[in-house]
């Protein structure tokens, strides 16, 4: 469908006829709506290429951003646990179907009205979730899939299989539209939670009746290798972060035990005239020494893991990882944390 825009000279000529009567008058809403609608439609994607051979389904990747907090705020703040867990050999994620008004999805619709929103899903990824192999396939094989990032509190990446589109860390509002037959591979999630809205775009009745050609999708082997390497790197990073969290929890427990034993020994020394069991004090001191040895060992091991994580995490993502590790502390005693964290530096 084409659009005819009047030339500048004709527009000026029409305007000059009524120049005296419209100087103080605001443009009519009807004209403003027409211009706005035209501009919006011209900015939209086109998923069908018109050629001499007919309508051909495009194999392009469309990247944009959306004001998701305004459009999908209720989905972002939804804490319901009605997601279905998918936990397979190389795939872990949570998913549930949702109903989204078409008006909120206008930005991913095509300008020619050849595709319509069919099914919508929310995909939630937690720390360690994601795809090490394979991809998520939703929707019509002759349609498109819009992947919209609603929330990302960690380091969340994705790869459109067979293309050069590899995102190591998606930002809130990032939107990617691709052929549904390609699928979407969510890379292993590092740190906090991420939520994606997946929209299946299916051919309209008008397009089906007109007819269209579905060409074979292209493939980028170098990108496949890069995505696999990145996925394995993220798996290693997650494993080291989990180890670091475990060491931190063990260290806090060791500091807690050390404080308790030291206080008990002080109590025994204060009442030395009453408590004459020197063997008891020797046992307590021995336990304190063992605890301090454990602390030293854990500190050395922790330093090694921190060095590994630093080498794997991108510099711009270190604050996200640091915040996630801090939130994972199990012992919440302020005194214990003060004693332990003042002597330990877990920041990457």
UniProtKB/Swiss-Prot annotation:
Xref: Pfam families? Pox_F11
Provide the alphabetized UniProt keywords.
Late protein
Going by the entry's taxonomy, the superkingdom of the source organism is recorded as: Viruses
**Induction trigger:** Expressed in the late phase of the viral replicative cycle.
Q: Which family does it belong to?
A: Belongs to the orthopoxvirus OPG055 family.
Which function does this protein serve? Stimulates increases in peripheral microtubule dynamics and may increase the motility of the infected cells, contributing to cell-to-cell spread of the virus. Seems to inhibit the signaling via the GTPase RHOA and DIAPH1/mDia.
- Name used for this protein in its record: Protein OPG055
């Amino acid at each position: 469908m084409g659009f005819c825009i009047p030339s500048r000279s004709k527009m000026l000529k029409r305007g000059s006829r009524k120049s005296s009567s419209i100087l103080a008058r605001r443009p009519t809403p009807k004209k403003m709506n027409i211009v706005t609608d035209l501009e919006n439609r011209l900015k939209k994607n086109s998923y069908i290429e018109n050629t001499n051979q007919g309508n051909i389904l495009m194999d392009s990747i469309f990247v944009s951003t959306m004001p998701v907090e305004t459009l999908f705020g209720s989905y972002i703040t939804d804490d319901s646990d009605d997601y279905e867990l998918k936990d397979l050999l190389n795939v872990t994620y949570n998913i549930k179907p949702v109903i989204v008004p078409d008006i909120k999805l206008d930005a991913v619709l095509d300008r020619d009205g050849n595709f319509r929103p069919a099914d919508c899903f929310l995909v939630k990824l937690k720390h360690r979730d994601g795809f090490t192999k394979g991809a998520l396939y939703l929707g019509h094989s002759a349609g498109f899939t819009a992947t919209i990032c609603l929330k990302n509190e960690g380091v969340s990446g994705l790869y459109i299989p067979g293309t050069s589109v590899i995102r190591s860390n998606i930002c809130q509002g990032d939107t990617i539209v691709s052929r549904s037959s390609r699928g979407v591979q969510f890379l292993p999630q590092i740190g906090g939670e991420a939520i994606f809205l997946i929209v299946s775009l299916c051919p309209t009745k008008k397009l089906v009746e007109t007819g269209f050609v579905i060409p074979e999708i292209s493939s980028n082997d170098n990108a496949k290798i890069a995505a696999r390497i990145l996925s394995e790197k993220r798996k290693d990073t997650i494993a080291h972060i989990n180890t670091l969290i475990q060491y931190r929890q063990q260290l806090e427990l060791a500091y807690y035990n050390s404080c308790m034993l030291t206080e008990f020994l002080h109590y025994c020394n204060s009442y030395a005239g009453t408590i004459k069991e020197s063997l008891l004090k020797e046992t307590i001191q021995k336990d304190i020494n063992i605890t301090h040895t454990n602390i030293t060992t854990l500190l050395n091991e922790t330093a090694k893991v921190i060095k590994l994580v630093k080498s794997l995490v991108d510099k711009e993502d270190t604050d996200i990882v640091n915040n996630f590790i801090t939130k994972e502390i199990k012992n919440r005693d302020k005194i214990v944390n003060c004693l332990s964290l003042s002597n330990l530096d877990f920041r990457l």
